UniProtKB/Swiss-Prot annotation:
Similarity comment: family membership: Belongs to the ATPase gamma chain family.
Presence of the UniProt keyword rRNA-binding in the record: no
Membrane topology: Peripheral membrane protein
Gene responsible for this protein: atpG
Source organism of the structure: Bordetella pertussis (strain Tohama I / ATCC BAA-589 / NCTC 13251)
Subcellular location: Cell inner membrane
Claim: Transport is one of the keywords in the record: yes
Main localization, broad class: membrane
Quaternary structure note: F-type ATPases have 2 components, CF(1) - the catalytic core - and CF(0) - the membrane proton channel. CF(1) has five subunits: alpha(3), beta(3), gamma(1), delta(1), epsilon(1). CF(0) has three main subunits: a, b and c.
Annotated protein name in UniProt: ATP synthase gamma chain
Record's function text: Produces ATP from ADP in the presence of a proton gradient across the membrane. The gamma chain is believed to be important in regulating ATPase activity and the flow of protons through the CF(0) complex.
């Protein structure tokens, strides 16, 4: 059995660790609220862009944008969104497992893959497995910069438009609620019919799917023309979805970190209680031994 001094040192060490995890829990809780606000802030914008784009395409059926055209898949692009830091439970492990499974599936189907990494953890994974990296962006901070994100993803979008890849996927963690985050592997391009939102999940949706009516009795006046407007809207819509993928991951990261740090703090409290019990028993045993020695010495006299 360890001595009293050793136990006291262990208790002090665990107490110090608990202070750190408790502080990290509080910081993560604060960042989580801000991340959730940013995640939800883009929903009204995405809703309106989708509704207008759906209206334009319905009113101009003769024009088919490349983002909407299905084609034989021979090569794909994958955007992997992870965190820059750890200490967020199994968040990165779960999305990495899903991504590796999909990459293996593409390999079995002889489909070429080129990847973009957002976050140090994803970059490390793709580097280890020898994936073809065409762009990367790390150290995004707590508030993602749209220009940096679009700069990294532009090469994938250009390759899609020029036919070098036939589909674009994003692997990210979808925020469901504070206690639940879901790893998802979603196809962004080509866009699905009706411009469905790939981040829909029960009541936690980016926005409701726009209802496309076939009996429009009115239309917009387009400047300079409908084709240019559709091109710009769909480009912005796809960019918005990619931004949303990063925002969802950041909200999930802070939620997972808060839960992980709370669990660590609770476990530390339990360990302190167990160590305190051992300390008390050891101390009591030492006192009892000393009393026995005194009594034994007195009896001998």
């Amino acid at each position: 059995m360890p001595g009293i001094k050793e136990i006291r040192t262990k208790i002090k060490s665990v107490q110090n660790t608990r202070k750190i995890t408790k502080a990290m829990e509080m910081v993560a809780a604060s960042k989580m609220r801000k991340a959730q606000e940013r995640m939800r802030a883009g929903r009204p914008y995405a809703t309106k862009v989708r509704e207008i784009a759906a209206h334009l395409m319905q009113a101009n059926p003769e024009y088919s944008h490349p983002y909407l055209v299905e084609r034989e898949v021979k090569a794909v692009g994958v955007v992997l969104v992870t965190t820059d830091k750890g200490l967020c439970g199994g968040l990165n492990t779960n999305i990495s497992r899903v991504t590796l499974s999909k990459l293996k599936e593409f390999e079995q189907r002889s489909i070429k893959v080129q990847a973009t990494a957002f976050g140090n953890k994803g970059l490390g994974l793709l580097t280890r497995i020898g994936a073809k990296l065409v762009s990367q962006e790390v150290q995004l901070g707590d508030k993602p910069d749209l220009d940096r994100l679009l700069g990294a993803i532009k090469v994938q979008l250009d390759d899609y438009l020029e036919g070098r890849i036939d589909a674009l996927y994003v692997a990210t963690t979808r925020f469901v609620n504070t206690m639940k985050q879901e790893p998802v592997f979603l196809r962004l391009l080509p866009l699905s019919n009706g411009l469905d939102d790939p981040f829909q999940s029960g009541v936690e949706t980016l926005a409701k799917t726009a209802e496309i009516k076939s009996d429009y009795s009115w239309d917009y006046i387009y400047e300079p023309d409908a084709k240019s407007v559709i091109d710009d809207l769909l480009q912005r819509y796809v960019e918005g979805l990619l931004y949303q993928a990063v925002a969802e991951n950041m909200a999930s990261e802070q939620s997972a970190r808060m839960v992980a740090m709370k669990s660590a703090s609770d476990n530390a409290k339990k360990v302190i209680g167990d160590l305190q019990l051992v300390y008390n028993k050891t101390r009591q045993a030492a006192i009892t031994k000393e009393i026995s020695e005194i009594v034994g010495g007195a009896a001998a006299v």
